[in-house]
Structures are given as C-alpha cells and as structure tokens.
C-alpha cells in the first residue's frame, strides 16, 4: 500500500497547526493594540514573550515625577520627545519607596526598604538581622547586606554573564565609605558629584568583597571603550549620572542649572553612544526611568499590590510606594511612539531582566501576579 496519503495527511496537520498558531499570535497582537488619542500606539498587558535581548542598559534619573519628566512642558525635550518617539513609554511605572537609595536596591535585588535605607543611608551601616520573610526579604536594619542576600549581578556572574556599573565621578572604582562610617558623598562637591546612595552595587557585601569589584564598578568614562564591540559590552550596563547630570541638584555646585535641563544635556551626549553601539544594534535594550517621584510629600503612590514591607510599614514614608515616574524602553523589539498602561514598578523591572537572562526571581520580583514586560512592551518584531 502506498504511504503517500499518510505523508500528505501529516503534512496537512503540520500546515494546519502552523496556520492556527500564526492566527493565534496575530489575534493576540490585534487584541493588544489600540490607538491613543495622541496618535501613539497603546498596548495592553500580555505576558509570556521575551525577545532574544542579550545586552541591557539601565539609566536612572533622580526625583522626577511622571508629569514633569514626560509631560508636554518637560524641561528635557530630548528625553520626553526625541527619545520617547523611538520606543514604548510605560506610563504607569512606579517607584517602590522614598527616598532614593531603596529604589536602586529594589532594581538590583528585590529587597524592600527599612528606615535607614529610607533615610538614604547617611551612615554606611552594616545590615543586622538573622531572619527572612517571604518573598525573600532580609529582616533587620541597616544598609549593607550580607553576602547571603542575592542580587542580579551575582546571579549574572553565577551564570557566566557579565555586568558593570558605570558611575559618573566615582573616580576610584568600587568606591564606598568605610563600613559603619558617615557617608561623605551625601552632598556634591566641585569636581566630585558622585553619590554612593545612587550606586546600589555598594550595598551588597558579595559585590564589595569580591576581588573583581574594581573591574566591574567603574567610572562612566570607561563606557565608550566598552561599547566599541559587542564582545566588550557587558550583558548588563547599569549607568548612573552624577548628582547634577541625574537632575538631583538644582542648581549644581559647579554652576550648571541641574534638574531636567542637565538631564537633557547629559542624555544628548551619552544615549547616542549607546544607541550607535554594536551591542545595542544587535540585541540591545535601553531602559530610562527615575528612582522616585519628587518627594514623599508630593507622591507616595504605588502599584502592583505593594504594601507594608517586613522592615517598613510605609515604603514611601507617607504612602505605599515611590510615586508614578514612568519609564521608557528602547529596543528593536519596541514599536516607535508606543505606550503601555500596564502597571509596573522597580520590582517588575528586576523580574523582567531576570526573564531576559533566564534567572530565578529575587525578593519582591517573586510576587505572585507581578507584571513583567511582555508583548505590551515588546510590541515590534516579535514575529521576525
């Protein structure tokens, strides 16, 4: 008996399945795409898709609420208009705490705040605590976590992936105060506007005690050299401007205006270097956000079910979070001039980065139901 009809039947089944799968994916995209009143494309949350990103760049600006950064009268038009037109704006993205320091720590570890962290760690104090609470929270007080507390950088290293923190004005690599001493970088100085509290790597003993900390936590001036090729660009590049260029100070100690005007000028210099790099062009993603809204008094709102933490009943001091700040994601997998209304926060960002690098979730990134970037963010080129 001829077997040709059997082969044809199998082929038809495979073809039918492929067509059905394609229609399902197309239908999913159709369902998530809508047209906003301002002409931008809005997307609703869809989970389960992670593009083949291999190089991620994260930039934080300081203490800027959503309206001041992204609104029509923004003093940073390069960010709010030029760059915004190139990617997807997450317009319900929130900080997780007040003041600055715990937001940076949240992005790298999923750890919630405690009172010392909420006070920006005026003393570079040892974290003291012997217990944990779900989800993955170290219970105690202080700022510098023991080696037992995990972080995204240590996860990456364990998997053979690379990372670097690029800190403007750090000068000496891996620079931090003496343990349990007052932090002398709380206020900018002429010629040195580095702030330890904006360098979250320095709050994990597993990093600061590592033999290669000085190779991985470096001055921003090293970034152009590392961007020269994809092979020399870390899988994670975490970039922190100084206290003037991140918009924290206004005016700045060197006479510049500070605020969003200085943010705008800094981004115009550094973002093109990233966007034109081989790593970004090949498989890169750039995330630009703020650490928190302007102040605990102006906005301490939260999203994503954030509530009391084991070490702080009010992570935002006057409320549950760090306020609405927004975030911009640029990538070949993000559609220009698009936006997402899905609620996200810094724990969502951590979980999304762990998705990209196929890592287990840390701390509050484990939260059940926490939104992670999906087709609402990666809304372009998913079928290419």
Model region roles, listed by residue range:
Residues 39-384:
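N-terminal pro-sequences and low-complexity stem/linker regions of secreted or lumenal proteins
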